[in-house]
Amino acid sequence: PEMSRGLGDVYKRQELLREAKRLGFSDFQIARFVLKPEGTNMEKENLAVRARRKELGILPAVKRINTVASEHPELTNYLYMTYAVQGYDVNYYKNEKSVVVLGSGAYRIGSSVEFDWCGVQALQTIRKEGYRSVMINYNPETVSTDYDMCDRLYFDELTFERVMDILE
């Protein structure tokens, strides 16, 4: 209730914007709800919310997916981004060259396995050429999301906001 009443104050109240992000609202949804840009360029409004969020230091944390029920220290490359906690589970190597591959997402008739195979081939070529490979995909059914296919695997949505958060 307070969230819906107060989103108009998003540019004034850092804690409200942080809470909106923690609850899962995208920058696009916040822009549409707060700025109500009927007939305007939503890309511009979306970028305005993104810029304000970054200016306020509201950034997602990168966490590892726990695949072993905390039985021993987690060292997988399965990652996701969240606003629910702070702190990173991984270190970033800014001096190492990385190439990001966008995954196939959900399987669709006529464009599923073939598109995933393209991603796998891209990841193998990236590694062969000596670059760090990063895959962003939310479909665990694909070969490209196997743990040994890439150096970093983000199980996350394929949206402008999420891809940019990972790239930055």
Give, region by region, the residue ranges found by the protein language model:
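Short alpha-helical "recognition helix" segments of helix-turn-helix
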Residues: 19, 30-31
